[in-house]
C-alpha cells in the first residue's frame, strides 16, 4: 500500500504571509501544507515511514518542512530560522533589510555567503539578479497594493540593477546608492544547499526538505526505491500534471501562476524581465529544474521562465540540468534524460 507524504505548498508566498502569522501553531501550517501541494513523495509501507521525523515552520514568508531519517528535525529548523533572520527582505529586523536601508554593512557569515553564492550563480545566467530589489518593491506584486508603475520610475530602478552595483570587501557589503538586494530568486534554493551540508555532516541516510518552490531530496529511501515527485498542473494548481522519478537531487519550480495581480484586464506576474523592468512576457506557464545545486535549480528555473520555450529547448540535452517546462498551449518540454522517468497524469497535455 502506498502512503502519500506531502512535501511542498502551492500556496503563493504572498498569500501565506496574510493567511498565517509566525505565531500560529505548527498544526495549522501542516494542514495548509497538506491541502496546498506541488510535490508529493510516495513511501511504501508503514515500517519505512516510521523511520522519519518531521519538523515544520514558517521562514521567508513561506512553509519550510524537513522530514529526516536517523536524526531530529530541530537542528534543521534552527538553521533555517537563522537563514530567515539574515535573508528575509520583508522583515524589518532582518539583516538584508537593514543593509538595503543603510547601503553598507559588515555582514554576518550567513548573509555574506548567500550574497557570494548568488553572484557566482549569476555568472552562468543572463536574466536574473539579486540587485533587482528596488524594481520588485516598485511593482509591489507581493504586497497589499500592486500597481503598474510609470515608465520613468521603472527605468530609474533598472539603473540600479547589476553585479557592478554591489561591492564586497572582507565582510563588508556596499551597495551603490539606490540599489536594493532581494534574494527571492535564490534564497530558498540556497537554503536547501545549506541544509544538505548539515545532513551530510550528520550522516543522515535520507531526508526530504521543501521550502516554498524549492525541494531537496537527500540520500536513499529506506525501501530502496527512487523518489517520486508530483509536478502540479499550472492551469489547475490543485491537480497533479505528471510524476517524475529521480535519485537524490534539488528541484525548483518557477511559474507566473503562483503570484500575480491584474490591472485593466492584464495579468502581471512576480517574475521580472530585467530587459524591460516589467513582469516577464513569456509563453511558459511553469518550469521545473532538477540538478545537483539548490541555488542553481532556483535561479535557472526563473531564467528559463523568462526566456520562454526557445531558451528551454537549448537546455533539454544538458548534462547538468534536467528540465520540465509547460507552455501556454499545454505542451510539455522535458529533458531527454527524463524520457523513461515521467508518467503523464493529464492526457490533455502533449509531452514533446
Regions found by a protein language model. Name each.
Residues 2-352:
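Mature catalytic core of soluble alpha/beta enzymes
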Amino acid at each position: 500500500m502506498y502512503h502519500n507524504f506531502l512535501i511542498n505548498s502551492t500556496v503563493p508566498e504572498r498569500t501565506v504571509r496574510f493567511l498565517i502569522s509566525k505565531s500560529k501553531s505548527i498544526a495549522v501550517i501542516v494542514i495548509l501544507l497538506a491541502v496546498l501541494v506541488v510535490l508529493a513523495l510516495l513511501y511504501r509501507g508503514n515500517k519505512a515511514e516510521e523511520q522519519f521525523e518531521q519538523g515544520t515552520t514558517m521562514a521567508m514568508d513561506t512553509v519550510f518542512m524537513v522530514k529526516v531519517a536517523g536524526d531530529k528535525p530541530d537542528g534543521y529548523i534552527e538553521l533555517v530560522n537563522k537563514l530567515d533572520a539574515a535573508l528575509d527582505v520583508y522583515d524589518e529586523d532582518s539583516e538584508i533589510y537593514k543593509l538595503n536601508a543603510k547601503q553598507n554593512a559588515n555582514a554576518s557569515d550567513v548573509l555574506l555567503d548567500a550574497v557570494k553564492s548568488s553572484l557566482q550563480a549569476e555568472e552562468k545566467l543572463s536574466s536574473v539578479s539579486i540587485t533587482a530589489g528596488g524594481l520588485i518593491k516598485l511593482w509591489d506584486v507581493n504586497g497589499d497594493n500592486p500597481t503598474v508603475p510609470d515608465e520613468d520610475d521603472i527605468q530609474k530602478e533598472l539603473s540600479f540593477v547589476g553585479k557592478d552595483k554591489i561591492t564586497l570587501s572582507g565582510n563588508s557589503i556596499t551597495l551603490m546608492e539606490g540599489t536594493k538586494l532581494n534574494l527571492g530568486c535564490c534564497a530558498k534554493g540556497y537554503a536547501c544547499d545549506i541544509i544538505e551540508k548539515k545532513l551530510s555532516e550528520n550522516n543522515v541516510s535520507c531526508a526530504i526538505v521543501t521550502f516554498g518552490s524549492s525541494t531537496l531530496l537527500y540520500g536513499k529511501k529506506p525501501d530502496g526505491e527512487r523518489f517520486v515527485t508530483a509536478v502540479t498542473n499550472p492551469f489547475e494548481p490543485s491537480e497533479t500534471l505528471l510524476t517524475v522519478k529521480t535519485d537524490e537531487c534539488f528541484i525548483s519550480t518557477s511559474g507566473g501562476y503562483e503570484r500575480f495581480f491584474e490591472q485593466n484586464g492584464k495579468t502581471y506576474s512576480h517574475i521580472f524581465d530585467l530587459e524591460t523592468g516589467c513582469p516577464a512576457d513569456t509563453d511558459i506557464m511553469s518550469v521545473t529544474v532538477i540538478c545537483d545545486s539548490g541555488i542553481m535549480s532556483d535561479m535557472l528555473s526563473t531564467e528559463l521562465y523568462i526566456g520562454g520555450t526557445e531558451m528551454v529547448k537549448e537546455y533539454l540535452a544538458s548534462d547538468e540540468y534536467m528540465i520540465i517546462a509547460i507552455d501556454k498551449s499545454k505542451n510539455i518540454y522535458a529533458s531527454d534524460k527524463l524520457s523513461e522517468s515521467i508518467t503523464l497524469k493529464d492526457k490533455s497535455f502533449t509531452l514533446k
